[in-house]
Every structure is written in C-alpha cells, then in structure tokens.
C-alpha cells in the first residue's frame, strides 16, 4: 500500500511539472521514498516549488541549478551508498553527520540545510542559536518560509535573504556574527563559493587546511588527515573569523 501511494504521488508530481512547462530530462529513484529529477525550466522556481509542495505527502528537499543536496538518516557510509556519492563530480562540497539535540530525527531535519525556495544555497552548522525565534519571526515577516524548527535552517534562510537583497557572501557572514546570538560555526555553499563563519566566542571547533590545490575543513583534524596522506599544517580559525573561497 505504501509503495502504491508513492507511485501515485510521483505521477501527480510529473503531471504538475508538465503543467508548469518543466521538461523532465531525467528522473530516478534515489531511495524507495525519494526521487531525483533533472528538469529543464526557465520559469519562477518559487512558484514551481509551491505548486509541487501543494500536493499532499510531497516535500521538496532541495531545488537548484548547480548544487545538489543529499539529506537522509544514517551514518556517512550508509547515506553515501544510498545515493552513490562516490560518483559525484564538482568543485566543492559540505556535509555534517550529527546527533540531533533539539530537533526531530527525520530527513527534513538532516543537514545540509536548504533555504526554501532559493536556488543553490546550502548550510551545515554546529552550535546553538539563542535568538532563533526572534530572528525567525523577522525573516518570516520578510516573506521567507521555514520547513523545520531546527535553528540550523535559520542560517540558510538568513544567508539566502541577504544574497537575494544584494549582499555579498562575505558581507552576509560578517553580519550574521553581529545579528545572530549563540555559539556557532557554520559553512555555506553557493554555486561558486564556499564560506566559513565563527561566532564571537569560537566555542565550536573548526580545523582548516589550505593549499594551492585544496581547501579542507572539519570539526576534528583527524578527518582531514584521513584524506590527505602527506604531513600537513592545519589552522584553527579564531573568534569572529570569516573566510570565503571561490570555487
């Protein structure tokens, strides 16, 4: 019965994509409950997302022209195997395996976070935002929508709101340190940039290795050394540090 409902929901999604003149170029089953579409579409992504999500039981986990978000339950090896991450190609990637402390344990609350319905903005975050509800209400008054109650999502929506209103990624990261309270370290990926920001106390760990060929960041140095065989020198970003790299 469940599989039949999933097939019916996919058929409804296909129908609405056609109604919006979105051309499905490729679709496949990522898991038994998730589908991945490659479409040709020149219209309003916000309108498309709203129309698809109006279907009962259907949720868009990410939508973009350059970034692809993978969100699911399980450890890194499990999720990589489910979605074939070893076959992905690109210039930059962010990821976060975490234990949920104040949010639900479900796909919606998994990292990376997407800022609905903005294209190509993703965030991973370690920490806690203490003025979450105040900042969320302000962003909602500006017309933004939240898909969860996790404070990490606020950083994605905040960043998307700033970039949409003409701020650079570096400006957005610096302003977030001034306007958002709490202890946090977070990374932002856009179509062509990677950004880092740490709060005023730098309580949450981050280790950075940078060379002419690669930029690697992790909560623990052992994670970087696991993928770089030679001896390296790492750096711990300081409080209020902001960095942006071009992909």
Model features per residue range: what roles?
Residues 1-247:
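Conserved short alpha-helical segments that host acidic/polar catalytic motifs at enzyme active sites
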């Amino acid at each position: 019965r469940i599989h039949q409902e999933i097939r019916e929901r996919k058929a409804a999604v296909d129908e609405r994509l056609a109604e919006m003149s979105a051309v499905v170029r490729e679709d496949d089953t990522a898991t038994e409950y998730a589908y991945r579409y490659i479409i040709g579409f020149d219209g309003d992504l916000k309108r498309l997302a709203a129309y698809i999500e109006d279907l009962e039981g259907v949720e868009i986990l990410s939508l973009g022209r350059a970034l692809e978000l993978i969100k699911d339950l399980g450890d890194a090896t499990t999720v990589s195997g489910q979605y074939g991450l070893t076959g992905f190609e690109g210039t930059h990637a962010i990821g976060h395996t975490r234990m949920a402390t104040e949010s639900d344990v479900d796909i919606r609350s998994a990292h990376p976070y997407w800022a609905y319905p903005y294209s190509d903005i993703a965030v991973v975050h370690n920490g806690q935002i203490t003025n979450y509800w105040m900042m969320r209400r302000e962003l909602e008054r500006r017309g933004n929508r939240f898909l969860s109650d996790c404070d990490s999502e606020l950083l994605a929506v905040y960043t998307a709101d700033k970039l949409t209103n003409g701020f650079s990624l570096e400006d957005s990261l610096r302003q977030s340190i001034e306007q958002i309270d709490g202890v946090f370290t977070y990374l932002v990926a856009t179509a062509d940039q990677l950004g880092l920001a740490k709060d005023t106390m730098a309580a949450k760990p981050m280790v950075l290795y940078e060379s002419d060929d690669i930029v690697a960041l992790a909560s623990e140095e052992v994670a970087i050394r696991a993928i770089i065989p030679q001896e390296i020198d790492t750096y711990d970003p300081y409080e209020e540090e902001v960095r942006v790299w071009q992909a």
